[in-house]
Amino acid sequence: MNNLLDILNKSINYLEKKNIKNARIVTETVFSQILGIERIMLYANFEKVLSDGDIARIKEKLNEITTQNNEISDKEIFEGNSENLKSLIDKSVSYLEKNNINEAKLIAEIIFSHVLEIDRMLLFTKYKENLDKEKTDKIRNFIQKVGKEKFPVQYLLNEQEFYGRKFYVNTGVLIPRQDTEVLVEEAIKTLRSEKTETPKILDIGTGSGAIGITLALEIPDSKIMGTDISDKALEISEKNKSLLNAENIKFFKSDLFENIEYKKFDMIISNPPYIASDETKVMSEDTLLHEPDEALFAEDEGLYFYREISFQGKEYLRNGGYILFETGYKQAETVKKIMEITGYKNVNIIKDMQNIGRVVTGQKLES
């Protein structure tokens, strides 16, 4: 049977026998490009039957990889300083691609934009210009770190955009994802529809503070508490609070509800660690190598924090208050059942742009 998973595993074994570095990542990248499926979603489509044409293109690409040296020397990124900006960008993209970096062109442009202090969309206006040695060396170092070490560009530049705002990030916190904007959107929608005067919100596992700070700025009459067990995360969330002038949010250390005294929140919101320990095979290398494990992985097949927050959370919500979770791939239905068993009403699943259940909401309603 020519299903995706069988062909993928055979391809990985083939490259490993040929001593290709990072065989799994290389293979997944090839499949992603040829099949038009995001690399992280390949395993979700493991039963997909591949056409003879797809298999032929995959074989051709794998053979090409084994017959050429895909490594590019660091010196080859920029040879000399006389080349113009367009040439340097092209070489950087080539280097990142040959080191199996997804979205190589976008990442290269982000790095150039940051170093040159110019909007990424305006880089083309400088294509014919030459860079000085200082900027060239800085860009080279950034490109090498992403290509060689698989170091996330967000950590490299200490910046990630979320909900239209730039947040400071480093390796002490998870990089805010676009998926989490679905959670924030649903929270804003719920709060505005309720028209609660000065809503009280608890953000558990705040990390960089992206969720809580965004809600604080979008709902300016709210009062928000953001908690985390990590001292590093709390330092970063405080930094973002200051950078973005979010005055109506406070951060403090707490293991879930351990240090929380207030028990009439209008909303509890959380994007907790939800990855099971056996799911590392579908995760990107940069995430595994550099993002904090404590922000990624959870016991009980990734469901531990959903159970704990759901169970304990009822004591901290006012009657009529809401609880909102972001969930991992294929977790939404299970989390919905956990919340229903725990006694929440009006439990709903909200899907993201890819039609995947991303957010689960419920309400505390007691007679």
Regions found by a protein language model. Give the residues of each.
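Non-catalytic nucleic-acid substrate-recognition regions in nucleic-acid-modifying enzymes
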Residues: M1-N22, V26, D52-I107
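Conserved hydrophobic residues forming the short capping helix/wall of the S-adenosyl-L-methionine
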Residues: L15, L96, L191, K241, ...
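Short helix-capping segments at alpha-helix termini
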Residues: I20, I101, I219-D221, S242-E247, ...
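Residue-level signal for inorganic ion chemistry
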Residues: V30, I111, K150, T180, ...
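Conserved AdoMet
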Residues: Q33-E83, S87, F112-K189
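Conserved Class I SAM-dependent methyltransferase catalytic core
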Residues: Y168, D300-Q363
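Conserved SAM/SAH cofactor-binding pocket of Class I
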Residues: I175-V282, E308
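Mobile active-site "lid"/loop adjacent to the S-adenosyl-L-methionine
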Residues: Y274-F305
